[in-house]
Amino acid sequence: MIQQQTMLDVADNSGAKRVMCIKVLGGTRRKYASIGDVIVVSIKEAIPQAKVKKGEVARAVIVRTAREVKRPDGSYIRFDGNSAVLINKDLEPIGTRIFGPVARELRARKFMKIISLAPEVL
């Protein structure tokens, strides 16, 4: 569960390291986001010569959450931390590589480019 002010790690090579959620997209007064949801983030930490700079506002899709997510078969999946991948307006990833595993729920949300770049899909 991600809400406003939540800090997330960035799981791609766009150059951002840490981002903060500033808005959960999808519906009025929506409070929480989970795996596969698109959020608006502010970049809080970035490396030099990055595609994005500190202080920029971007969109991101959540790929890992520390809060468990229930699957249709009754099983649960959770990760060690909260991570996101930065995306552009066309929902394409800004980076060219994804680090760490991503959840299978992204496939149902049509984020096939992220699924194909990820080293492992759980």
UniProtKB/Swiss-Prot annotation:
GO terms for biological process: translation. GO terms for molecular function: large ribosomal subunit rRNA binding; structural constituent of ribosome. Keywords: Ribonucleoprotein, Ribosomal protein, RNA-binding, rRNA-binding. The keyword Protein transport does not apply. GO terms for cellular component: cytosolic large ribosomal subunit. It holds the Pfam family Ribosomal_L14. InterPro entries: Ribosomal_uL14, Ribosomal_uL14_bac-type, Ribosomal_uL14_CS, Ribosomal_uL14_sf. The keyword Chaperone does not apply. Binds to 23S rRNA. Forms part of two intersubunit bridges in the 70S ribosome. Belongs to the universal ribosomal protein uL14 family. Part of the 50S ribosomal subunit. Forms a cluster with proteins L3 and L19. In the 70S ribosome, L14 and L19 interact and together make contacts with the 16S rRNA in bridges B5 and B8. This is Large ribosomal subunit protein uL14. It comes from Anaeromyxobacter dehalogenans (strain 2CP-C).
